[in-house]
Swiss-Prot record:
Induction: Up-regulated within 1 hour in the left ventricle following the application of pressure overload by aortic banding. Predominantly expressed in heart and skeletal muscle, and expressed at lower levels in adrenal gland, brain, kidney, liver, and testis. Acts as an activator of serum response factor (SRF)-dependent transcription possibly by inducing nuclear translocation of MKL1 or MKL2 and through a mechanism requiring Rho-actin signaling. It is found in: Cytoplasm, Myofibril, Sarcomere; Cytoplasm, Cytoskeleton. The keyword Transport applies. Residues 193-293 are annotated as: Actin-binding 1. This is Actin-binding Rho-activating protein. Binds F-actin and ABLIM1, ABLIM2 and ABLIM3. Interaction with ABLIM2 and ABLIM3 enhances activity. It comes from Rattus norvegicus. Pfam families: Costars.
Length: 375
């Protein structure tokens, strides 16, 4: 038989063999999935209907070690029907190729952790009350008590401290208007006739002088000051005042805005700046326009410094120490960095950093113009 005829006959046989192998692999995979589904459904059916804390806990299953990799079996040879039925029962008991692994839960939510902290504290207070403080390990208790996990508690404490501080400052600044009802000023012994009184009167006056005001009056006065400070430094009043201030500023700005319906021509003309006034020709301080102008000035100044650095690195030095370069050479070098060569040169000359002849520079026409770096 010729070699060509052998190859032609082997081609269809090889393709048929590959088809049979693929079909067998798909059948085995489907059988494995079906077996896994049956086992999973059986295990779920055996589990309890509801969850009880600590009542039903499955024992940890040891993961099965995967066996050696099994290759796809060769296409079976035709056998009688009885053999097929026996083989089907044996294949049903084969171990599935799907790997399973038990996953244990290791992450506990924050709510459970806080509940555990509370239980731990109550247990320590109930059972370890008689133990001395030196023996108790206070690290865990201090960590729980001194922790600032709650932002609400932290915010309330901060507000309370600030209000109390402001109230006491106001109370220190204001002079007390109440008097001690223990003794009047006229009868306190202060005056010129102090020396003429007998020693008994002096002793009585000294004893009366060290008396303190009644607690009821002092408490009433401190409560009054605290109420005044609370009303004066209340958060609601502060928020209301800020909103009112913003509303007044907005109304005033709308009166000066020519594009607003509330524009007041007379007010705008009376408040406008004239030439020579401070702030004339500049944006209003604190506005967005002023911020953009500041950023633009910083950007232009940075580009001017870069231009001076390029001139300093590529130019030749004169005898007097100054650096010179022609406009054509600078244009060919700096145009790769920025296309604003002429504008930056004009700006640098305005600031006194460079000098060149003429009001404007043109490429090709003014390539011979000498640019001198002054600083």
């Amino acid at each position: 038989m010729a070699p060509g005829e052998t190859e032609r006959e082997a081609g269809p046989a090889k393709s048929a063999l590959q088809k049979v192998r693929r079909a067998t692999l798909v059948i085995n995979l489907a059988r494995g999935w079906q077996q896994w589904a049956n086992e999973n459904s059986t295990r779920q059916a055996q589990e309890p209907a509801g969850w009880l804390p600590g009542a039903t806990q499955d024992l940890p299953h040891t993961p099965k070690e995967p066996g050696p990799r099994q290759h796809a079996p060769k296409p079976p040879s035709p056998k009688p029907d009885g053999d097929r039925e026996g083989r089907g029962s044996e294949e049903a008991t084969e171990v599935s190729h799907i790997k399973r692994k038990e996953v244990t839960r290791t992450v506990v939510s924050k709510a459970y952790e806080r509940g555990g902290d509370v239980n731990y504290l109550s247990h320590r207070y109930e059972h370890d009350g008689g133990v001395s403080e030196a023996v108790q390990p206070d690290n865990d208790i201090d960590r729980i008590l001194l922790s600032h996990d709650s932002p609400t508690r932290r915010r309330k404490c901060t507000n309370l401290v600030s209000e109390l501080t402001k109230g006491w400052k106001v109370m220190e600044q204001e002079e007390p208007k109440w008097k001690s009802d223990s003794i009047d000023t006229e009868d306190s012994g202060y005056g010129g006739d102090m020396e003429e009184r007998p020693e008994q009167d002096v002793a009585q006056v000294a004893a009366a002088r060290i008396k303190r005001p009644l607690h009821s009056q002092a408490n009433r006065y401190s409560e009054t000051l605290n109420c005044k400070a609370h009303r004066k430094y209340s958060q609601v009043d502060n928020l209301k005042g800020r909103w009112q201030q913003w509303a007044d500023e907005h109304i005033q700005s709308q009166k000066l805005n020519p594009f607003s319906d509330e524009f007041d021509y007379d007010l705008a003309m009376s408040t406008r700046l004239h030439k020579g006034d401070e702030g004339y020709g500049r944006p209003k301080e604190g506005s967005k326009t002023a911020e953009r102008a500041k950023r633009a000035e910083e950007h232009i100044y940075r580009e001017i410094m870069e231009l001076c650095f390029v001139i300093r690195t590529m130019a030749r030095h004169r005898r007097d120490g100054k650096i010179q370069v022609t406009f054509g050479e600078l244009f060919d070098r700096y145009v790769r960095i920025s296309d604003k060569v002429v504008g930056i040169l004009m700006r640098a000359r305005k600031h006194g950093l460079v000098h060149f002849e003429g009001e404007m520079l043109w490429q090709g026409k003014d390539d011979h113009v000498v640019i001198t770096l002054l600083e």
